[in-house]
Amino acid sequence: NTEAAYDALSNGMKTLLANRRARHEINESVATVHPVIRTHPVTGRKSIYVNDIFTRGIVNLPPDESDAILPFLKRHVQRPDFTYRHTWDEGDVVIWDNRCTQHYAINDFEGRRVVHRVGFFAEPFAE
């Protein structure tokens, strides 16, 4: 829950991150910049938008400062109190809002399973 993770930041950290942008890279030729803090277009709640896989650095910060803050944020959003772990049973349906969550699939299910993924398109983030 990246909204709860944002809410738990100190006011000083929230101020430091306000209007900051981070570089996200899939590889050297595919990169973009996103706000570190995003606002949900429906609820208006703020959330942290960094992740272990793609977020490489906070732009317009000295590298040593970015290198200190970014790992903190990545660990912070993964804290157990912001995490939901589902134990699957037959017939389960799980729905989440990708605008304020991060997800990671764990292969902890023995046997065959069928997964259907559905995407809904909504308003873009207010940036």
What are the language-model segments listed below?
Residues 1-93, 98-127:
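Non-heme Fe(II) oxygenase catalytic core, chiefly the N-lobe of the double-stranded beta-helix
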